[in-house]
Amino acid sequence: MSEFNFISRLHNRGLISHITNEDNLSKLIENKSISLYCGFDPTEESLHIGHLLPLIMLKRFQIAGHRPIILIGGATSLIGDPSFKEKERVFNSNYNVNIWTEKITKQISCFLDFNCGKNSAVLLNNNTWFKQINILSFLRDVGKYFSVNTMINRAAVKQRITRPDQGISFTEFSYNLLQAYDFFILNQQYQADLQIGGADQWGNISSGMHLIHRKTKRVVYGLTVPLLIQSNGIKFGKTESGTIWLDSNKTSPYKFYQFWMNIEDANVYYFLKLFTFIKVSEINKLEKNKNIKNQIINDKSLLAKHITQLVHGKEKLLAAERITKFLFLKNTTHIEESDLQQLKQDGIPFIEVSNVKDLQEALVLTSLAQSRTQAKNMIISNSISINTEKIRKNHIFHEKDKLFGKFTLLSRGKKQHSLLCW
């Protein structure tokens, strides 16, 4: 297989976990434009960074001339995918799913081009066909093609079945058939020959390929991207303070940017290959120089810039960079009121104040100091700053200390900060 074909380039970036009939799929997509799809169940009001790889994969295919189909699981989200889940999901209401569908649709729409000719992206909702099918038709037309023996041995659900304290309901057990039917419908009506997803979706994707082959004798394909696990065993995108969301109202662009700045050094160049469109040859050159002073930090910044702009746009990237310079480089020149609102949202601890008189009191209130005595000693030792300016004696707050009349940044050393909100 040529090292220059599309599938080989995906391998070269470490983007493929599973793939079926690789040679045939590679020939197919080199010879014609295909349609492919990826599904997203609206089980929350926002997608998170665990969804980024499939979204970016769709974008890569579109850039290569193929038509991406995004399937919103308006129906399947009412059931919930049990794959590798330790316990049964809590059912979501129709009301919530409808609201979440609207929000997630807007998020996803920013990633792809919906007006570029034959390979314009398509956005669908599987509620369109599931609301039209009755249970008897589904069991006859779909269920008869699946062996329960095979289904219970799938790794995605086997751990639940073998746990007497949990088990799995018939409702969740049937999810596999619902997703298989999605692939069948998209293949029949939209000529989707490929489904992509996370590695945990391999069982569901395989079921879709099986159903299509049994009903139509057609050969279709599946491809999954890696599931990323951090060194502590936690799924990528989870932090001590919670999930990193794509919605700027749930995770500010600044916090999103900082997440990438704080990834483990060992992952920097791998993530540049996974999440950016920078050429692999250029990334390899950067990696060769990683031991040069500040090179890793610069390359983390490159990663953070690319992904923040992809998800949030240029303006919010610039805001994240301004806030970073404000906190860590003491640069207040271009800081804006909206930047400080981001810090208040989730960037650093904050407290609402009205009548705080002096710095020692404020340090105790913000827990930067445990007592006024400790606060006094920290001030004397030159470790306290107000709005990035060092303070060497106790300070009475004035209007000039309030940025935009609302905010005062207190810092202890380089890494501990708190925001006074007046």
UniProtKB/Swiss-Prot annotation:
One BP annotation, GO: tyrosyl-tRNA aminoacylation
Residues the entry annotates as binding L-tyrosine: 37, 175, 179
Domain S4 RNA-binding: residue ranges: 357-414
Source taxon at top rank: Bacteria
Cellular component, GO, one term: cytosol
Gene Ontology molecular function, alphabetical: ATP binding; RNA binding; tyrosine-tRNA ligase activity
Subunit structure: Homodimer.
Name of the protein: Tyrosine--tRNA ligase
Organism: Buchnera aphidicola subsp. Acyrthosiphon pisum (strain APS) (Acyrthosiphon pisum symbiotic bacterium)
